[in-house]
Amino acid sequence: MRYLMITIMMLLAWGVSAPKVNAEVSRADIERGKSLTFGRKKGNCLACHVIADGTLPGNSGPPLVAMKARFPDREKLKEQIYDARKRNVNTIMPPFGAHEILTAEELERVVDYIYSL
């Protein structure tokens, strides 16, 4: 018990805090992400997922709803889009980041939009 208290006191003294959340996402970033998500040239997420406001969605992937509940950690969502094979080697989802289908900036915008759903 003594060591636990010492450890807690040391962590508090060093200023350990929770990870920062990307709360500074602009409306323009979300709109750019939506454009990429719905566009057929880059993201084309509608080909496989049901998304609010989307027309003619596919159904081979899960619907993109309640994303903050499904991915409380935004980085986990980003990792999933970057390369879904890391969590499921048999996935049919393309590795958008690993295969450079999306640039790093485009990936951030897509994550901004999807995380807003």
Predicted regions and their residues:
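Bacterial N-terminal signal peptides
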Residues: 6-14
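Electrostatic cytochrome c docking/interface patches
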Residues: 19-40
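Extracytoplasmic/secreted proteins, especially bacterial periplasmic and envelope-associated proteins
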Residues: 32-36, 72, 76, 105-109
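Gly/Gly-Pro-rich "capping" loops immediately C-terminal to redox-active cysteine motifs
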Residues: 38, 46-82
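Cys/His-enriched microdomains
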Residues: 43
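Axial heme c-ligation environment in periplasmic c-type cytochrome domains
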Residues: 58-67, 82-109
